[in-house]
């Protein structure tokens, strides 16, 4: 499994660089969100991506036999980097391959406090990536770095 968490401005070159090293059936997890900072703007807005989302762009750039999953887009890096605290966020997992999503949901389950939800096809990344900009805005407004999402009224898939 390869996890891509780079600024949007670096996504294209990163995908081109790793493409020759990827193996058939390998899972690539895209965490990148197309924030406006990629073009000198604000982190509370996204830029429109021709493919629909950063995940769909990444998928187009990958070999057809590599499985793209979008996940962790709405989880603060600050939380994921602090191994002494439970994450206490939900992770929305999108992709077009059920087995690849199940593998990523298993990874989510291994993170203390995190819960994973199968959020459907990679197309749904369009909405999920937009939520990240909103979360950045809320975190700034409330002076925190770790605000995230919790889905209520249903059981997680992980």
What positions do the PLM features span?
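Rossmann-like NAD(P)-binding element
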Residues: 1-29, 33-41
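Glycine-rich beta-alpha junction loops
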Residues: 10, 32-35, 75-76, 97, ...
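Active-site phosphate/pyrophosphate- and oxyanion-stabilizing loops and adjacent acidic/basic residues
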Residues: 16, 56, 60, 106
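Short, structured coil segments at secondary-structure junctions
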Residues: 24, 62-64, 111-112
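General beta-strand structural signal in soluble alpha/beta enzymes
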Residues: 29, 67-73, 116-119
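Short beta-strand and adjoining strand-loop segment in the mid-core
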Residues: 41-51, 56, 82-99
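Rossmann-fold dehydrogenase core element
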Residues: 48-73
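Active-site-lining helix/loop region of Rossmann-like oxidoreductase modules
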Residues: 88-158
């Amino acid at each position: 499994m390869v996890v891509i968490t780079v600024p949007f401005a670096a996504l294209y070159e990163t995908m081109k660089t790793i493409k020759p090293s990827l193996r058939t059936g390998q899972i690539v997890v895209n965490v990148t969100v197309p924030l406006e900072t990629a073009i000198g703007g604000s982190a509370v807005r996204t830029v429109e991506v021709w493919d629909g989302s950063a995940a769909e762009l990444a998928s187009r750039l990958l070999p057809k036999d590599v499985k793209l999953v979008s996940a962790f887009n709405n989880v603060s890096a600050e939380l994921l980097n602090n191994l002494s605290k439970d994450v206490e966020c939900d992770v929305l997992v999108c992709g077009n391959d059920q087995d690849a999503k199940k593998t990523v949901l298993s990874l989510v389950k291994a993170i203390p406090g995190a819960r994973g939800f199968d959020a459907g096809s990679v197309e749904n990344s369009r909405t999920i990536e937009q939520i990240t900009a909103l979360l950045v805005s809320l975190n700034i407004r409330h002076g925190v770095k770790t605000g995230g999402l919790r889905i209520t009224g249903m059981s997680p898939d992980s």
